[in-house]
Amino acid sequence: MTQSLHYSSPRETLTDTIMMAKIRKNLTFEAINQGTGLSLAFVTAALLGQHPLPEQAARVVAEKLDLDEDAIRLLQTIPLRGSIPGGVPTDPTIYRFYEMVQIYGSTLKALVHEQFGDGIISAINFKLDIKKVPDPDGGERAVITLDGKYLPTKPF
């Protein structure tokens, strides 16, 4: 039976347990994800408390991290989403995404509306990918793909 959480602390506690096991076992998110049949981004978000995992994927993850049956069930619950507390983020990496939206948010909105019409890009019917590529000027670049379904506003 599908269960849902009405507050975030159970998943936050589980996330702490998961992260400690990941560190203790010296595992990457990629290694934990192997065998789940799901994307790396989705499983990582689930391990950080933002998505439920299907039972099979929860069991694969639990085996790698030595999690118990209660943790397996909790990994399958629908969480209270939103991992960033109110206000401006202070973590430098998260802040840069905030900064990108501050600078390019109105541009993205204008271009989405111009190309698609009045509506939104779904974060539910959504895929996320990140790749590291060489920078021709030296160093490396991050290529981040946000792939969401367009949902038009429907008058009623």
Swiss-Prot record:
Family matches, as SMART domains: Cyanate_lyase
Pfam short name (any one): CYNS_N
EC number(s) reported in the record: 4.2.1.104
Entry keyword Transmembrane helix: no
An example molecular function term from Gene Ontology annotations: DNA binding
GO BP field: cyanate metabolic process
Class of this enzyme: lyase
Catalytic activity: cyanate + hydrogencarbonate + 3 H(+) = NH4(+) + 2 CO2
Catalytic residues (UniProt): 96, 99, 122
Domain of life: Bacteria
Keyword annotations: Lyase
Bilayer-spanning residue ranges: none
Database matches in PANTHER family: CYANATE HYDRATASE
Role this protein plays: Catalyzes the reaction of cyanate with bicarbonate to produce ammonia and carbon dioxide.
Family: Belongs to the cyanase family.
Protein name: Cyanate hydratase
Lineage: Bacteria, Pseudomonadati, Pseudomonadota, Gammaproteobacteria, Enterobacterales
Gene name tied to this protein: cynS
